[in-house]
Amino acid sequence: MINIWDNGGGRKIFVQPRMKKELACLVIHGIGRQKPDFADGLVARVSAQLHTLGHDPEVVAWQSVYWDDILRPAQDAYLKAAYQGADLNARAVRTLLLHALGDAAGYRQLPSGRRRGGEETMSYRRIHERVRDAVRSLYREPLASRPVPFVVVAHSFGGHILSNYIWDCQRRPDKRSSSFERMNWLSGFITFGCNIPLFTFACTEVVPIRFPHPGCRRTLSAMHAG
């Protein structure tokens, strides 16, 4: 924040130190076409609401995870070939369904010739690398490597991605990363239109992620029935 003070004989500019962050918030989008700035509206509205309630929105450090560009090229290439090769009707519906279902299929589908099992696909690894880079950026830049309570906000399929990412961090933690980057400061998991239950039907035993971390002093669980 910059304050300008005029003493009558000239203008002096004072740069105030940045306010320390008290909460970190990671936002990830769901299925369908998205833009890199998908989270801007959410951040602006939440910040405005915090201000209305008498809280300084500057104490929240925000970071978004954009991954649509990883899966989009293959889907767009297929649609282009399909539309050029046949006079297909209902193109808007076809495109919508392919983008929605294609994200889920491309995230975990094994490449041809690979054995079925616990192996991750290249897309799975690339998307998780995008999450890892976002968490690292959040920790090292706005937080200045100072851990604070960590909340994730996920829409639709983004909740499934983050759940898998947290699971991997808990089962195969990277000892070179900080406790914050290993998701040990996770204090809240907020989802919108979460479809995680759909991905449990193939499991003989559903084992959830450990949440909250034993180091968290308090947790609040809430579900909206609407």
How would you describe each model-predicted region?
Residues 25-33, 37-45, 113-224:
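Serine-dependent carboxylesterase/thioesterase catalytic core
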Residues 52-55, 90-95, 180, 216-221:
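Short, surface-exposed, polar/charged, turn-prone segments marking secondary-structure boundaries
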Residues 2-83, 210-211, 218, 222-226:
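N-terminal low-complexity, Ser/Thr- and acidic-residue-enriched intrinsically disordered segments
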